[in-house]
Amino acid sequence: GLSVVVIDFGLKNAILRESSRRKWNITVLPYTATAEEILRLDPDGVVLSSGPGNPNNVRRSVLEMIRTVQTKVPMFAIGLGHELFGIANGANVQQIPVEHHGVNHPIHEIITDHIVYATQAEGYLIDRNSVDRSQLFITYVDMLDNSVQGLRHRRYPAFSVQFFPDGAPGPDETDGLFDEFVDTMNRRGDRH
């Protein structure tokens, strides 16, 4: 199976379950791991997990790790990981007055024009006006408030979602994002 490093910001079991279903060889590292420690493991990909807390309080070294690792291996960031991926690439994250919680938020996937329903538990969101369009493009938006729900890097095989793509709890129509990550890792592996 593919070798995947998961950076633990408050890892959900559902992410491990999705990884197991795809027969990944998982190494879980703490958020304090450096880019060198991660890359020494020679992973096929890196997942930045979801978790609690204010993304604006993260150590600068975490942002430096993201900026370095995204240039070397495919990256998939979820929840807090998505927010940190955004910050590392120049976006701002702000606390929202009314948190998003629920299992069937309508999310617009821009590239396909499809509507998917996803589970959310969000207290912070990427400020859409702060997204550096030369670095990132917005891939998903919340249909209720037009908030940024997904990002993709323009130059590197790195993407992120604010919502839970694992269907636990809630709809599983977005768990194809894990398959997209597998495809990204496989394409990257073909170049070696």
Where are each of the predicted segments found?
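Residues that mark the start of a beta-strand
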Residues: 3-5, 25, 74, 117, ...
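RNA-binding accessory domains that recognize and position tRNA/RNA substrates
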Residues: 1-41, 53, 166-168, 180-192
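A short, acidic, flexible beta-alpha connecting loop/helix-capping segment that sits on the rim
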Residues: 155, 164-169
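Structured helix-beta-strand junction loops
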Residues: 22, 41, 71-72, 134, ...
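Active-site-proximal beta-strand elements of phosphoester/diester hydrolases
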Residues: 3-8, 118-119, 159-163
